[in-house]
Amino acid sequence: MTEAANSTPAQPEFQIQRIYVKDVSFEAPNTPVVFQKEWQPEIKLDMDTQTQVLGQDVYEVALTLTVTCKLGEETAFLCEVKQAGIFTAANLDAQNLAHCLGAFCPNILFPYARETVAGLVSRGSFPQLNLAPVNFDALFASHIAQLEAEQAKAGVQ
């Protein structure tokens, strides 16, 4: 009975230790002129994630959102938010750990980053900006498929 208990694989563990804003930037380089123009904005959202190992089974995941708003050729505003979290992820195989850090954690961080962006845009006296939800699972799957295709292509050459 003791042998069976010792041979049982450890259960996967996941825990949020902390969520915080790591960096924030807001620029409105063409104010007040842009306030007098017709509001037909072109919004561009760029996202990036970085992962850093902090200790055994402890990771920092940082999600960076860069929102650029243009009116024609002029930049109305540029907003960048780096939202980060410290997570414990233990007893996961490499594939599940990669998914956890590359999709699950950014999915947790996104609402916080979206709220920070909305607040900054509002404080800049611009119309409300609500970023649409992001499917991080699909983005992660696409990224893995792209990596596998590149590896297959490199193996063929």
Swiss-Prot record:
Molecular function per GO: unfolded protein binding
Quaternary structure and partners: Homotetramer, a dimer of dimers. One homotetramer interacts with 1 SecA dimer.
Source organism (scientific name): Tolumonas auensis (strain DSM 9187 / NBRC 110442 / TA 4)
Keywords of the record: Chaperone, Cytoplasm, Protein transport, Translocation, Transport
Family to which the UniProt record says this protein belongs: Belongs to the SecB family.
Subcellular location: Cytoplasm
GO cellular component: cytoplasm
Function: One of the proteins required for the normal export of preproteins out of the cell cytoplasm. It is a molecular chaperone that binds to a subset of precursor proteins, maintaining them in a translocation-competent state. It also specifically binds to its receptor SecA.
Gene Ontology BP terms: protein folding; protein tetramerization; protein transport
Protein name: Protein-export protein SecB
